């Protein structure tokens, strides 16, 4: 029973870490990354469709993304979707390929992005701590129901804390990497 609680807590903490990585990867650095356009939805036959389903996105060089649209008739819709996104990008089309140059980030914008990254990181840490609290509550419930001893409870809570510390450290590493990426480019 305790092993199941620990496994469940670790799985949920891993999901929180992956969610944080996903959120942070969408934050634009000066470097061209295809994942930057993942959140863009294109109006396609009356429905909002993810850009990834309608086009291939690759990094052409350090500051340019190339979007190759599968259906020529969608080029203007894809261009409009990129232009109206809140990413501040200005696409230009050439044949079936849309080039998206990334403007360099100003120092002020970099600092704003770092604040956003830190906020996302804090939310990730809160999510991990909530998982720890839930696991500890389950352990206390087992103690209350006399299914485990106090020694087992303390040992299990210490193990949950160790797992929590590991994931908090991983969050800090992800944040440090993203901050470095934002400031270096």
From Swiss-Prot:
Q: Which InterPro entries match?
A: Ribosome_recyc_fac, Ribosome_recyc_fac_dom, RRF_sf
Q: Name one Pfam family in it.
A: RRF
Superkingdom in the source lineage: Bacteria
CDD domains found in the cross-reference section: RRF
Q: Name one GO molecular function term.
A: ribosomal large subunit binding
Q: Where is it localised? A: Cytoplasm
UniProt keyword terms in alphabetical order: Cytoplasm, Protein biosynthesis
Main location (coarse class): cytoplasm
A single GO BP term for this record reads: cytoplasmic translational termination
> Is ATP-binding set as a keyword in this record?
no
GO CC term, one of those recorded: cytosol
Name the protein family: Belongs to the RRF family.
Instruction: Report the protein's function.
Output: Responsible for the release of ribosomes from messenger RNA at the termination of protein biosynthesis. May increase the efficiency of translation by recycling ribosomes from one round of translation to another.
Protein name listed in UniProt: Ribosome-recycling factor
């Amino acid at each position: 029973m305790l092993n199941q609680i620990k496994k469940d807590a670790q799985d949920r903490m891993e999901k929180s870490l992956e969610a944080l990585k996903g959120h942070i990867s969408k934050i634009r650095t000066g470097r061209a990354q295809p994942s930057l356009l993942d959140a863009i939805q294109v109006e396609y036959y009356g429905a909002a469709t993810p850009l990834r389903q309608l086009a291939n996105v690759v990094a052409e060089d350090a500051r340019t993304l190339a979007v190759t649209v599968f259906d020529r008739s969608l080029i203007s819709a894809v261009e409009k979707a990129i232009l109206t996104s809140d990413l501040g990008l200005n696409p230009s089309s050439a044949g079936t390929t849309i080039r998206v140059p990334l403007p360099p980030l100003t120092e002020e914008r970099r600092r704003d992005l770092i604040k956003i990254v830190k906020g996302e990181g804090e939310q990730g840490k809160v999510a991990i701590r909530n998982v720890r609290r839930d696991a500890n509550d389950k352990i206390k419930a087992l103690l209350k129901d006399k299914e485990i001893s106090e020694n087992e409870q303390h040992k299990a809570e210490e193990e949950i804390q160790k797992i929590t510390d590991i994931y908090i450290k991983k969050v800090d590493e992800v944040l440090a990497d993203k901050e470095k990426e934002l400031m270096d480019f």
